[in-house]
């Protein structure tokens, strides 16, 4: 255990929610490299994958405004030190003025915001004056400012607790469908607020990310299967791939031929293969795109109809409305995401259990 500090074990536990001794062993195994220890735990199926954002202490609000014509929208994350201050009327006024300034000066970054004028002085001066009045450090941490070109609609959703906000842009072709597209965008934004997709589409993933996530996923399924086997329950299929970006034309053609060879070996007449193979291919794709189903907006199953993915919902609306709909932008803010939880007096407890 030489060189592995109690603080490092605590940090790994906060990041993964794995057991303390598992964290200790992982750090020893990888010579104290935190990122490698996280990967080690995930590949062993020991990480409970607790998101850092679920464990942070940052307070404040996520606020957004969608203009009445649904052609632009602003969203901002403003952090305070305590929840009490976030509910303060002075803080609420600061949030309102922040959105107004973003809108008035076409701002897209926090740097632009701080330099922008408000009441004949830089916004940064106004912010400092409010920090002095309110008595806590306040940070404008993130800004999203979306603009919609012709035949695009922007809508969004902010959770009532002001801790999550989502903006969605949808492209459409038929102007008469605009009101329905507005409603669809809001419903999908509500879905994303609840289900936390990381990206819009699997194309937004890197191959390295997918391979790493797939290893962790396989370890998780194998661990679940051990318990299922013990209880006499059906086992889950172990995937070869994790995302649609791995399923090249060559991979799909190879799998189709494998299914056809299997049917041939079973003595099934070739004339019925076309009725069997598509269903097998559909199941193969579903089993081998689990990362997409978990982490992409288009790949997730819709909370209002869990038999359809978001992509299928959009396709069905396109067909029903005689239109061609495409989600072109997706932005999700969650309060404090990526900020580490304030250190607690926990290192001593870890140290005692490591002796």
UniProtKB/Swiss-Prot annotation:
Subcellular location: Cytoplasm
Main localization, broad class: cytoplasm
Region listing for Involved in Mg(2+) ion dislocation from EF-Tu, in residue ranges: 82-85
Annotated Gene3D superfamilies: 1.10.286.20, DNA helicase RuvA subunit, C-terminal domain, Elongation factor Ts, dimerisation domain
Entry keywords, A to Z: Cytoplasm, Elongation factor, Protein biosynthesis
GO cellular component, one term: cytoplasm
Function noted in UniProt: Associates with the EF-Tu.GDP complex and induces the exchange of GDP to GTP. It remains bound to the aminoacyl-tRNA.EF-Tu.GTP complex up to the GTP hydrolysis stage on the ribosome.
Similarity field: Belongs to the EF-Ts family.
Listed name of the protein: Elongation factor Ts
């Amino acid at each position: 255990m030489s060189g592995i500090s109690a603080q490092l074990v605590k940090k790994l536990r906060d990041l993964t929610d794995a057991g303390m001794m598992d964290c200790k062993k992982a750090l020893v195994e990888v010579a104290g490299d935190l990122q490698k220890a996280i990967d080690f735990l995930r590949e062993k199926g020991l990480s409970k994958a607790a998101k850092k954002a679920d464990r942070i202490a940052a307070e404040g609000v996520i606020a957004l405004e969608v203009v009445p014509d649904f052609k632009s929208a602003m969203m901002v994350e403003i952090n305070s030190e305590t929840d009490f201050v976030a509910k303060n009327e002075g803080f609420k006024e600061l949030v309102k003025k922040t959105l107004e300034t973003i809108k008035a000066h076409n701002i897209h970054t926090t740097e632009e915001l701080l330099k922008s004028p408000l009441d004949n002085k830089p916004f940064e001066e106004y912010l400092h004056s409010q920090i002095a009045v309110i008595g806590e450090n306040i940070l404008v941490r993130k800004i999203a400012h979306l603009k919609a070109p012709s035949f695009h609609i922007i809508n969004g959703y902010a959770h009532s607790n002001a801790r999550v906000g989502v903006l969605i842009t949808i492209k459409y072709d038929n102007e008469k469908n605009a009101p329905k597209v507005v409603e669809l965008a809001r419903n999908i934004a509500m879905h994303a607020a609840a289900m936390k997709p990381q990206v819009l589409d699997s194309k937004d993933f890197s191959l390295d990310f997918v391979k790493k996530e797939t290893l962790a996923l396989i370890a998780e399924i194998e661990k679940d299967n051990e318990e299922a086997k013990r209880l006499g329950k059906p086992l889950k299929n172990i995937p070869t791939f994790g995302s649609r970006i791995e399923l090249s034309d060559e991979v799909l053609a190879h799998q189709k031929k494998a299914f056809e060879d299997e049917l041939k070996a079973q003595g099934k007449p070739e004339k019925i293969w076309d009725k069997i193979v598509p269903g097998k291919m559909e199941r193969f794709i579903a089993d081998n795109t689990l990362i997409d189903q978990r982490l992409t907006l288009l790949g997730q199953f819709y909370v209002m109809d869990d038999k359809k993915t978001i992509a299928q919902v959009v396709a069905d609306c396109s067909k029903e409305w005689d239109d061609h709909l495409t989600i072109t932008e997706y932005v999700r803010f969650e309060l404090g995401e990526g900020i580490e939880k304030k250190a607690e007096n926990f290192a001593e407890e870890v140290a005692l259990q490591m002796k």
